[in-house]
Amino acid sequence: DFLIAATHGRGMFALDVRQLQKVTPTVVASVAHLFDAENGALPAGGGRGRGGFNYERAYVHYWLGDDAAVTLEIQDAQGSMVNVLEAGGSAGLHQAEWALDRLGGNQGGRGGGFFRRPNFVEPGDYTAVLTVNGVEYRTTLTPGRR
């Protein structure tokens, strides 16, 4: 669901309101709430060769009732840290974006490293761990191939 505003000229703005629609009075009254994540899709062929490089990022949405100390980590099925996402700690609705890559994961490409590509994770189950003032909230992400 999108809210779209446009002018008769060239301007247009589209806002994805799906997460906003999930903000209930119970969510607003909570210290923190972690919504179901958007899985994303890895490129066919891992971003190498004929499969192409198109992929969809994964998104983690969360609500904070008040300003808080926040961290957001992606873990693999074994509980090992895969990536740490930038996470805002101000009160309100937040979205964090994961490029489906491993932390520090740019791989060199042809051209002396000029063309860099992400070190994509493999398809499978991952866990987003949101820590708010020392309390953990978890949701599952399952990125697959395009």
Q: Which stretches of residues belong to each language-model region?
A:
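Beta-strand signatures of extracellular beta-sandwich domains
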Residues: 71-75
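Glycine-centered tight-turn motifs at strand-turn-strand junctions
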Residues: 81-119
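Surface-exposed coil/turn segments at beta-strand junctions on protein surfaces, enriched
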Residues: 53, 65, 89-91, 119-123
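Short beta-strand edge segments in extracellular beta-sheet folds
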Residues: 140-146
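Short acidic/polar inter-strand loop motif in beta-rich domains
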Residues: 11, 104-108, 131-139
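Beta-propeller blade termini and top-face loops
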Residues: 1-48, 55-67
